[in-house]
UniProtKB/Swiss-Prot annotation:
<feature type="transmembrane region" description="Helical; Name=2">
    <location>
        <begin position="375"/>
        <end position="395"/>
    </location>
</feature>
<feature type="topological domain" description="Lumenal">
    <location>
        <begin position="575"/>
        <end position="584"/>
    </location>
</feature>
<protein>
    <recommendedName>
        <fullName>Putative endoplasmic reticulum metallopeptidase 1-B</fullName>
        <ecNumber>3.4.-.-</ecNumber>
    </recommendedName>
</protein>
<feature type="transmembrane region" description="Helical; Name=7">
    <location>
        <begin position="554"/>
        <end position="574"/>
    </location>
</feature>
<keyword id="KW-0645">Protease</keyword>
<feature type="compositionally biased region" description="Basic and acidic residues">
    <location>
        <begin position="9"/>
        <end position="27"/>
    </location>
</feature>
<feature type="topological domain" description="Cytoplasmic">
    <location>
        <begin position="479"/>
        <end position="489"/>
    </location>
</feature>
<keyword id="KW-0479">Metal-binding</keyword>
<dbReference type="GO" id="GO:0005789">
    <property type="term" value="C:endoplasmic reticulum membrane"/>
</dbReference>
<keyword id="KW-1133">Transmembrane helix</keyword>
<keyword id="KW-0812">Transmembrane</keyword>
<keyword id="KW-0325">Glycoprotein</keyword>
<feature type="binding site">
    <location>
        <position position="192"/>
    </location>
    <ligand>
        <name>Zn(2+) 1</name>
    </ligand>
</feature>
<feature type="topological domain" description="Lumenal">
    <location>
        <begin position="641"/>
        <end position="895"/>
    </location>
</feature>
<feature type="binding site">
    <location>
        <position position="180"/>
    </location>
    <ligand>
        <name>Zn(2+) 1</name>
    </ligand>
</feature>
<feature type="binding site">
    <location>
        <position position="329"/>
    </location>
    <ligand>
        <name>Zn(2+) 2</name>
    </ligand>
</feature>
<feature type="transmembrane region" description="Helical; Name=1">
    <location>
        <begin position="40"/>
        <end position="60"/>
    </location>
</feature>
Length: 895
């Protein structure tokens, strides 16, 4: 370093730290009065600004239109009319695929409504209205996503279809709308997914009156087996004759009860399809963040979108209600709990989008529209922004390069102050991270997980309050060590360092082609201020500086708060069905917005009047500051926890219950010699959240409930009667089991028979293989667990052939029959991994026959348990439990 540069840095350091050489604090305060620093009034305005911003984004997030009546011209979607049939369908009760409620009551009511609409409009000129039904069978495999992957066979599942068009001849081009009318075994399906079916029936009424809108045919698919792993949609898109004309689809789903429906998947490719929604939707609510989060597998759920995309090779849109997810797949999912205005909003959006889509020239020749990945999001629910990802990359890189250039110039011209600001910026971030980590641990240790489950604002108290408080107070403390005349440069440098960090994050998103990086691009809008400062003087008036800073920070901070509100409202209910520690995820969501606010205000904090002297800004004061933040926050949480000791709440209008699952199981386990080693009746209690099974009141008080102890060493499912392969969602703390006295007596006990066993040798490597044929007899819903010994691998099944040899496999068989009894034949081939002699019985087969409906569904033990829960939860929050419970007949045998 040259002598001139050293001298310049020395002078810079002297000017910056001049405050330490002042003779007394009084002189310091006089200097502060002479320069343009922010006063308390400015900070009152800043606080009011962000308070209004938080309230405003929350209001916009929850805003819904008023339900409407039909208009005289029959051109207006009417929630009031749609909800009448919805209420009737919901009142049929639990309706899993194959049940009487599903196959007779619900299916026939939808058919009746379709026939009534057709009869009422039979004289409408130029209307073609076809109705069809389907009972379909097939097999396919589902890769790991919502579950851990499985092979599925189904038989006799039902579909109801209506096809509307203009003119006598069927159009060769059509658009598909899909809903499902079956339910989770213990749910009325008011929202998931009868609300979508009611919406589609209302659209059929409108198009029946206005066939001139039907430039192409529209197929309405009411499918009867989605909850059983997307079966009916697969049967339709692979076997029905109407499938060949479909050019696009709109899938309507629900993982919550009302609220604003979210477009969270679009494609694959076919940008014109996404544009139809973005250009036509009256109340758009979409985000590429939702699409990328869902496709990552973080969100626990799957929809028929996968089936139409993967097996039909058709592009589409996936729309779903995602708010109020507490009631999804529970007894509380009834029609009356759907937020008023939700169907009106969704119906208007789908109606306008479909009308736009039917006019699109790309529906006839979609290949002529160049496919490209896009960035899309709605800004606070007010309007939609969409642009190609290639343009996003270009803008991102230009912005990043600009920020880096500004930072490089600042580092060269103001080296010491840059190092000083960087040190303080890092200290502020580390302090926020330390406080968050401490609050996560202390809140979990002191008050338990999910305290914010019912009252979301408690998450803001637990994580938002200490983040903002710690960040601003620590930055103010560090600033107190500086000379007042140096704070302008110091504050500007802090702002530039913050922009550089955001640029680094945006660079990573750009490099990995993650479209969600738009959020960080918006946080770089304040770079305009740094550019202006570089080319000219930025006004020193504190009021002007405050207002302009807030205006430039508004797009990024508003979207950060809006996105956090959206993610919290979606993911907090999901935490009730996740066995992972939820505190880090929720603290991160809250801290993201809090951090965006605090760090964007770092420059203003540095340019504010500060009552501290340099002697009051040491390490000890920093420690006291952090401890004070933690102590006050924990005290506030303690006070709130004394009022609400349980995270759950029972309320007929808005219950937030603990999710549980119970299996009453007849369990018969055989050893290799074919002898029965276990013949027991067991009761499995499963908690789906992190608080675990010990949080269930009657489990906690009963010492006979114990943890899992696997009978077979190599059984990854540990004899737990999983309906689907979801063992990865649970850990040891989530499952408790005990023996019970009530032995289940089934009319048709589950049976597994080995039909044949043929040994062979692979001609390529000389290793042995065995081909088995089996027959399984059980209920309409059977889970099969295939578990070879450790020196064997599964190479083939009659359902599908695995891409690579598997250590174990999960098969799921479902069928619809009046007596709920089905027989399945399947083959399995296993291959030895060594050339040692073959074992006599190297294959373990487990069968769980699930009673999901009918008179044998629930034992007296289950009924008594549910009655006790319903009685106690009215007065005791800890008893606020919702239970999915049914009987299972299970057997394991070696072959």
């Amino acid at each position: 370093m040259s002598t001139g540069i050293r001298r310049r840095h020395a002078d810079e350091k002297k000017n910056i730290l001049e405050k330490e050489s002042l003779q007394n604090d009084e002189t310091q305060r006089e200097m502060e009065k002479d320069i343009s620093l922010l006063r308390p009034a400015h900070w009152n305005f800043i606080g009011l600004f962000f308070l209004v911003l938080i309230i405003g984004t929350t209001f916009l997030h929850k805003c819904l239109p008023e339900p409407k009546d039909p208009n005289q011209e029959e051109t207006q979607f009417s929630e009031k009319r749609a909800v009448k049939v919805l209420q009737e369908l919901s009142d049929y009760g639990w309706k899993p695929a194959g049940s009487y409620n599903c196959e007779e009551l619900t299916r026939n009511r939808i058919l009746k409504e379709l026939n009534d609409i057709r009869s009422q409009n039979q004289n409408v000129e130029n209307l073609r209205f076809d109705i069809d039904t389907q009972y379909v069978s097939g097999c396919f495999d589902i890769p790991a996503h919502d579950t851990e992957g499985m092979n599925i066979c189904y038989r006799n599942v039902s579909n109801v279809m209506a096809r509307l068009g203009k003119g006598e001849k069927k159009d060769k081009i059509s658009v598909l709308l899909n809903c499902h009318y079956d339910s989770w075994p213990t749910s009325n399906a008011g929202s998931d997914d009868l609300s979508s079916c009611a919406l589609m029936l209302e659209l059929i009424r409108l198009y029946s009156k206005n066939p001139h809108l039907l430039n192409h045919d529209v197929i309405f698919l009411f499918n009867g087996a989605e909850e059983s792993s997307l079966l009916a949609a697969h049967g339709f898109i692979t076997q029905h004759s109407w499938r060949h004309e479909i050019r696009a689809f709109i899938n309507l789903e629900a993982s919550g009860s009302g609220g604003r429906e979210l477009l969270f998947q679009a494609g694959p490719a076919n940008q014109w399809l996404l544009n139809s929604y973005l250009e036509a939707a009256i109340h758009p609510h979409c985000s590429v963040i939702g699409q990328e989060v869902f496709q990552s597998g973080v969100y626990p759920g799957d929809t028929d979108f996968r089936i139409f995309r993967d097996h039909g090779r058709v592009p589409g849109l996936d729309l779903a209600f995602v708010q109020n997810g507490y009631w999804w797949h529970t007894e509380f999912d009834t029609a009356e709990r759907i937020t008023k205005g939700s169907l009106q909003r969704a119906g208007e959006n789908v109606y306008s989008t479909l009308n736009h889509l039917l006019k699109s020239p790309y529906l006839e020749k979609p290949a002529e529209y160049a496919d490209r990945k896009t960035v899309f999001f709605d800004f606070l629910g007010l309007f939609v922004i969409i642009y190609p990802l290639s343009i996003a990359h270009l803008v991102n890189m230009l912005t990043i390069c600009t920020v880096i250039a500004l930072m490089s110039h600042r580092f060269y011209s103001k080296t010491f102050i840059t190092f000083l600001a960087l040190r303080d910026y890092v200290l502020t971030i580390l302090t926020i991270a330390l406080v968050l980590k401490a609050m996560t641990f202390m809140s979990l240790f002191t008050y338990g997980a999910l305290r914010w489950y019912t009252r979301h604002w408690l998450a803001l108290v637990a994580y938002g309050l200490p983040s903002v408080w710690a960040g601003i107070s620590v930055q103010g403390l560090l600033t107190a060590r500086l000379a007042p005349k140096a704070r302008e440069e110091y504050g500007s440098t802090l702002e530039l360092i913050h922009l550089t960090l955001i640029s680094g994050i945006l660079l990573a998103f750009t490099y990995y082609d993650i479209a969600s990086g738009f959020l960080f691009a918006l946080l770089l809008v304040p770079a305009i201020k740094s550019i202006i400062t570089y080319f000219g003087a930025w006004p020193t008036c504190p009021t002007f500086n405050t207002i302009l800073t807030l205006i430039l920070s508004f797009p990024g901070c508003a979207m950060a708060i809006y996105t956090t509100e959206m993610l919290l409202s979606i993911f907090i209910p999901i935490m009730g069905r996740s066995s992972y520690n939820p505190e880090p995820a929720v603290s991160f969501f809250v801290a993201f917005s809090a951090g965006c606010i605090v760090l964007s205000l770092g420059g203003l904090v540095a340019k504010s009047r500060n009552s501290r002297s340099s002697n009051e800004a040491g390490l000890l004061e920093l420690i006291y500051n952090i401890l004070g933040v933690l102590l006050v926050t924990l005290t506030i949480l303690y006070v709130f926890s004394s009022f609400w000791p349980s995270p759950y709440r029972f309320d007929n209008v808005y219950p937030t219950a603990k999710r549980t699952q119970f299996f009453h199981v007849n369990q018969m386990l055989y050893d290799r010699n074919g002898q029965i080693s276990v013949n027991d009746t067991r009761f499995y209690a499963i908690s789906h959240d992190y608080r675990g099974a010990e949080d269930i009141p009657f489990v906690k008080k009963d010492p006979e409930y114990t943890g899992l102890q696997c009978h077979y060493e190599n059984n990854p499912w540990c004899e737990t009667p999983f309906l689907f392969p979801t063992k990865g969602r649970l850990n040891e703390r989530n499952i408790r089991v005990r023996s019970v006295d009530e032995r289940l007596k089934f009319k048709h006990p589950v049976k597994i028979l080995g039909i044949s066993k043929r040994h062979g040798v692979d001609s390529k490597d000389g290793k042995g293989n065995i081909e088995y044929s089996f027959s399984v007899i059980g209920t309409g819903q059977i889970s099969v667990y295939i578990i070879p010994d450790t020196t064997w691998l599964i190479t083939n099944t009659s359902v599908t052939q695995p891409k690579t040899p598997q250590e174990n496999m999960f098969l799921y068989y479902t069928c619809s029959t009046p007596n709920n009894i089905c027989e399945w034949m399947f083959k399995v081939t296993i291959k030895k991994t060594t050339q040692t002699p073959s074992d006599d019985k190297p294959l373990l087969i487990g069968i769980s026959s699930h009673y999901l409906h009918g008179p044998e569904m629930q034992s007296e033990s289950i009924k008594n348990m549910i009655a006790k829960i319903q009685e106690n939860r009215v007065n005791s929050p800890e008893w606020t439990v919702t239970a999915s419970a049914w009987n299972v007949d299970q057997v394991y045998k070696y072959f």
